[in-house]
Structure formats: structure tokens, C-alpha cells
């Protein structure tokens, strides 16, 4: 990563000047067939169209220059080769590599060295152990419940949803994440415990929400006369309190160098996906992700899909100053994907301190959000078209549906109607529509991109997952921040434990005692807090 500040880069100054009068997408003839063909990229079964972004050749050249100045490619190579990228200079930090790409590098025989080679070999061993476990136990259970929170739930849940439409399965899958006991109670009402496998996922083995939910499940199983060890397995770091094969039926491993939000291609996602859809489906997902890892190493930005998309996002965020980005998938299989991206993007790049340890004076991660199309067209798209804030949109679509069932009505199939809506929204946002009635006038110039593949499969889902991982990481490299820690999450955990001690009549800690006691007193006028949650 370049030691110079993002703001001090010469390309930044060029882009600031260009942003004063960016291309007007509403001008007649601007969005031409030639522009649409030139501003597109074909890679790993995806077509990426950025003709509806407010960029031209000059802006793209300056963005390429900025990516070069900020050392994006070198930083990506360093990350994938296992160099330490999770650090803050001159201050205590995690100071370790970020090796999520190593969890899938082995499936394509990607050559690695040092830490990356070690984690790749270990990942291959864990996958082989998973294969053996599935061969032995998969037929013994009809249901799997994954207990975990954050990256131990959001990514695997998004992938499960993506695969269930294309991979036949007779298995039932549930996720329990929230410490709200109603989350666990709802699942327990649905399952036959005697035929259920529970996988508890926690890197540290001490995650509060996960430990509480596991205990709740264990108590329920015990009351039904079922052995904990016969039904519970774990995914955790070696040496954690959960790394205990005398307690669990099996323990699979993950490593500190793999962040939770980037862990879906490790055993964090592998166990539940392998159980639900079979070992081969998980391998295909790994192959797609590994293929996109190689794309992220392409030297030219025009051929490097994650880098190109990352720099378009930098343009929208830092130069056109758009505060949020919407991700709108036109596929039921991606129902939970925006929630995963929200964590991946905002937990990674929601930072205001540079890796140098200095405060930064520019915007970092936009607010990431989204919902399925066409549903979202009938909820918040009004604001996208005519709201006071311009929101760049990233559309994701597929030419064919997953399940193969469709019907033709009025000359077109449902899949064609879905795809037509996505294309129409992109055009409408860019071009707008003039009307003398101001309430019916659409100004346009609202940027978007289109990412399209033929069909959502395990392979394309793996590639899509890795595409967004690398896009987010490239942006962190460009901003000069550490995309791999999450001190804000740690702070909340620490203070919650202090508040709990106060609720239990113990010393809570100087950080929160006055505020917590006042707030707890406000909510405790009629009922003792220790009775909360009881019938």
C-alpha cells in the first residue's frame, strides 16, 4: 500500500476536478450502443455493464491512475500470499494476515508460499475431513441447525439461500444467531431433535450469543433424552474452549487469519452447505471463488472486475459524494445476499483511522443496503428515482431462473419479465424523463451497474461472493485503512458485559456505571430486571 495519503495522490486531485462536471447521462445520444459495448467486461461467466455510471474515458483513466498510485494490485498480491495486512502502525493491533483466499486456493492448484501455503494445506485437510464426516453421518440426520452470529451466520445463510434453488436436497436447514430466546424457540418448535445435527460456530469458542444459544439447545436436547455429543459438532479455532472432541461429535477448524465476514468458504460455510447440498456442491462453490481470486490479480483494471467495480465505487463515494449504495439482486436465491454484503462492506471499511494510525479526512464505506427486485420497486424505488439523495445501484441478475419452472403470459415468461424490469430500472435511473409537471419529472443521472450471469449455480455464487470480497478489500486498500479488524464490534461486547454485571448486582465498571444505572432504573420502575424474559 502506498504510504502517501489518499487525499495526497495526484490522481485524486485530477478526479476532484473531473467531478465538478461529470458526464451527463441524460444528454441525447450519450448512452449509445457503442458506449454500452465499450463500457462492459466479460469474466468468469459474468457480464458487467457500467455504461450507466457517470464515467467517461478521462475519468476511467484517472481512476486507473489512482488504483496504481495506491498500490491496489500489489496489496492484493500481498494479501493472497499471506503477508500481514491486518495491522495499525505504531499501535497494538491484530497484526496478522487475511487468508480467506487460501481456504479455496487449493481447488485450482494455486501456488502459494509461507502462511498462505500453510492455511491452504490445512483447509484442504479440513475439507477432506468434512467429506469423510458427510459420508459417515449425512444420512443419519434430516435437519441441520447452525448456531453462530455475524460472519458465522450471514454469509452461510446467504449461500444456503442461493443454492437451495439449484441443488436438490431433502435436508432442512435453520440458522440461530440472535441472543433473543425467541429465535431459538422458533427453531426448536420446528425440528425433530432426534434427527437434527447442530453445528456451533465460534472462532474464539466464547462468543456470548452463540454460547447462550448452544446451551439453550443443549438443555432442550437433554430434556428429550438425547446426548449432546451425538448431535452437536463445532467449528472453531484450534485450542479454543470448543476444540474438544470429547464433548462434540466432531470439531472442524478455522484460523485467526480468516475474518468472520470472509469465512464462508472455510468450514464456517462448508459444514452446513455440504450437509444440505452435498460435498460436490461445496467444492463447486470453492472453484468459483478461487477463479475470481485469480481475476483479482489481473494487472489491468479494465480486465480486473473487482478492482474496476471498486474504483467505480470510489468515484461515486469520494468524488460524486453519494453516501449510500444499494445492491438489488433480481433473483430469489440472493434474498439474504445484501445483508451479508452489508456486514462485509461496513464492518470492513466503516473506519475513520488510517493504517498509519492517523485520523482520515475523507469518506470511507458508504451505507450498504438492498432488497430483492422486483419487490423493492414497489417499496423504496420511489426514493431512488426522485428522492433528494442520489443512490448508486448495483443490479445483479440472471438470464435463467434456478428451478426451471416458468410460464408464458402475454408473450413473455416470468423470467423475461423479471429481467426486463431490471434493465428498465437501470435505464430509467440514468436517463430520467422530462415532464412539465414537476411531480412527474425525473431528472436522471442516477448511476448504476449491471452484473449478469446465465444462471445462479454453486460456481457462479462462489465467484459472486469472491467478487464482492475483493471489491471491498480493494476499496480499503485505496483508502489506506485496515479492512480486517472490527474494534466497534469489540467495544459493544465489552460494554454489554459490564451492563450485565450491573443488572446482576455486581460492579459494572467505570465506563458505563452511571449511564447504565440511570437507564436501567428508568426501565425498571415496575419490574425487576432479573425477571426479564420470564413468563
UniProtKB/Swiss-Prot annotation:
The keyword Secreted does not apply. GO terms for molecular function: carbohydrate derivative binding; glucose-6-phosphate isomerase activity; monosaccharide binding. One of its GO terms (biological process) is gluconeogenesis. SUPFAM superfamilies: SIS domain. It catalyses: alpha-D-glucose 6-phosphate = beta-D-fructose 6-phosphate. Its EC number is 5.3.1.9. It is found in: Cytoplasm. PANTHER family: GLUCOSE-6-PHOSPHATE ISOMERASE. This is Glucose-6-phosphate isomerase. It comes from Chlamydia felis (strain Fe/C-56) (Chlamydophila felis).
Amino acid at each position: 500500500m502506498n504510504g502517501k495519503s489518499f487525499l495526497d495522490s495526484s490522481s485524486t486531485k485530477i478526479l476532484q476536478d473531473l467531478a465538478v462536471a461529470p458526464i451527463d447521462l441524460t444528454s441525447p445520444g450519450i448512452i449509445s450502443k457503442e458506449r454500452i459495448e465499450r463500457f462492459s467486461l466479460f469474466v468468469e461467466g459474468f457480464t458487467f455493464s457500467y455504461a450507466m455510471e457517470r464515467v467517461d474515458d478521462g475519468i476511467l483513466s484517472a481512476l486507473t491512475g489512482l488504483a496504481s498510485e495506491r498500490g491496489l494490485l500489489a496489496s492484493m498480491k500481498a494479501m493472497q500470499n499471506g503477508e500481514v495486512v491486518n495491522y495499525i502502525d505504531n499501535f497494538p493491533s491484530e497484526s496478522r494476515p487475511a487468508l480467506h483466499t487460501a481456504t479455496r486456493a487449493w481447488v485450482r492448484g494455486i501456488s502459494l508460499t509461507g502462511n498462505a501455503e500453510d492455511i491452504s494445506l490445512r483447509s484442504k485437510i479440513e475439507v477432506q475431513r468434512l467429506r469423510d464426516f458427510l459420508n459417515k453421518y449425512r444420512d443419519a440426520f434430516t435437519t441441520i441447525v447452525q448456531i453462530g452470529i455475524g460472519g458465522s451466520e450471514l454469509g452461510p445463510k446467504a449461500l444456503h439461500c442461493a443454492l437451495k434453488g439449484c441443488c436438490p436436497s431433502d435436508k432442512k436447514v435453520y440458522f440461530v444467531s440472535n441472543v433473543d430466546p425467541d429465535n431459538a424457540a422458533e427453531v426448536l418448535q420446528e425440528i425433530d431433535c432426534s434427527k437434527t445435527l447442530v453445528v456451533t460456530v465460534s472462532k474464539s469458542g466464547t462468543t456470548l450469543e452463540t454460547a447462550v444459544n448452544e446451551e439453550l439447545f443443549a438443555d432442550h436436547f437433554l430434556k428429550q433424552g438425547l446426548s449432546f455429543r451425538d448431535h452437536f459438532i463445532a467449528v472453531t479455532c484450534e485450542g479454543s474452549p470448543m476444540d474438544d472432541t470429547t464433548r462434540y461429535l466432531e470439531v472442524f477448524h478455522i484460523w485467526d487469519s480468516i475474518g468472520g465476514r470472509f469465512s464462508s468458504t472455510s468450514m464456517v460455510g462448508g459444514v452446513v452447505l455440504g450437509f444440505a447440498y452435498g460435498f460436490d456442491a461445496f467444492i463447486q462453490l470453492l472453484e468459483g471463488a478461487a477463479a475470481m481470486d485469480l481475476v483479482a490479480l489481473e494487472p489491468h483494471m479494465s480486465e480486473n472486475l473487482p478492482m474496476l467495480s471498486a474504483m467505480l465505487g470510489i468515484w461515486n463515494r469520494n468524488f460524486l459524494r453519494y453516501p449510500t449504495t444499494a445492491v438489488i439482486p433480481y433473483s430469489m436465491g440472493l434474498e439474504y445476499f445484501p445483508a451479508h454484503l452489508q456486514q462485509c462492506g461496513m464492518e470492513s471499511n466503516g473506519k475513520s483511522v488510517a493504517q498509519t494510525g492517523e485520523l482520515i479526512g475523507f469518506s470511507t464505506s458508504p451505507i450498504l443496503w438492498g432488497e430483492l427486485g422486483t419487490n423493492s420497486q414497489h417499496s423504496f424505488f420511489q426514493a431512488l428515482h426522485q428522492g433528494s439523495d442520489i443512490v448508486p445501484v448495483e443490479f445483479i441478475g440472471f438470464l435463467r431462473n434456478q428451478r426451471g419452472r416458468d410460464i408464458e403470459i402475454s408473450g413473455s415468461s416470468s423470467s423475461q419479465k423479471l429481467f426486463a424490469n431490471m434493465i428498465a430500472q437501470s435505464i430509467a435511473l440514468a436517463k430520467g424523463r422530462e415532464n412539465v409537471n414537476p411531480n412527474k419529472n425525473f431528472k436522471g443521472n442516477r448511476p448504476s451497474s449491471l452484473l449478469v450471469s446465465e444462471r445462479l449455480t454453486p460456481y457462479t455464487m462462489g465467484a459472486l461472493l469472491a467478487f464482492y470480497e475483493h471489491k471491498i478489500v480493494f476499496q480499503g486498500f485505496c483508502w489506506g485503512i485496515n479492512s480486517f479488524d472490527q474494534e466497534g464490534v469489540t467495544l459493544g461486547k465489552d460494554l454489554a458485559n459490564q451492563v450485565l454485571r450491573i443488572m446482576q448486582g455486581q460492579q459494572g465498571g467505570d465506563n458505563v456505571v452511571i449511564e447504565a444505572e440511570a437507564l436501567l432504573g428508568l426501565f425498571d420502575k415496575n419490574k425487576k430486571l432479573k425477571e426479564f424474559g420470564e413468563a
